[in-house]
Amino acid sequence: MSEPNLNPAYTLDQAIANLQQTEDASARYYAAWWIGRFRAAQPETIAALLVALEDETDRSPDGGYPLRRNAAKALGKLGDRQVVPALIKALECEDYYVRESAAQALEGLGDARAMAPLMAKLTGGLAAAQLVEGKPHLAQPYEAIIEALGTLQAVESIGLIEPFLEHFSPKVQYAAARALFQLTGDNRYGDLLITALGGTDLQLRRSAMMDLGATGYLPGAQAIAKAFAENSLKLIALRDLWATHRQRQASSESKALSPASRQILELMDSLL
């Protein structure tokens, strides 16, 4: 879904007022997006977004909840963990895309309370992870759920995630490889993503590249730089790879760039 066009004259006061009113659904939708886009974390915005997360008035033709989706996305960007229980509740929404946005938001907030509810969504394994009849999506937003568990370092979920390496959706496979590398440090999962970069489908190469960047798996740097994809996306993936590597180094006494960090930066320079 594309982002709304940005109105440069829009203000925080307008966003709060538009989100709090209930007459104009499109104004509320834009306000929720704007608050998340600019990370306008204020008590008033958080309170209004929590109300929007349970909105019943803005319904799409297929029965979805567009405002709830934007509210969940915004709450994940504001960094206030008091909203975690509300986002966990949103994992039970009938709208697949609200559940997906809630899982992504919980990943962004990094709160361990989300681990068990997210793991519960993997119950049933591959047998349950099928397409919903008449819909373009699976029973659950497995990519978002698995990626969140990896980011949250939910080591208890390893056994639940492993079967998804065999899922029929390559993107779910990549999410599983990404999370399992984050949870185990086993290089074979990083190597699976490197192999995926050699695929014939551009969209899948892009997905594998972003997942590889999120792992911080250093052997993936050269593979990302050489992948057949847009340089702009390669730069994002390499930036994420570098940031993850540096975060792991943060506990070391040396503040100097490691040889691996220098190599990643040189690869980024070569793509500019």
From Swiss-Prot:
The keyword Lyase applies. The keyword RNA-binding does not apply. Keywords: Antenna complex, Lyase, Phycobilisome. GO terms for molecular function: lyase activity; oxidoreductase activity. Its EC number is 4.-.-.-. One of its GO terms (cellular component) is phycobilisome. It holds the Pfam family HEAT_PBS. It comes from the Bacteria. InterPro entries: ARM-like, ARM-type_fold, PBS_lyase_HEAT. CpcE and CpcF associate to form a lyase. Belongs to the CpcE/RpcE/PecE family. Required for the chromophorylation of the CpcA gene product. This is Phycocyanobilin lyase subunit alpha. The gene is cpcE.
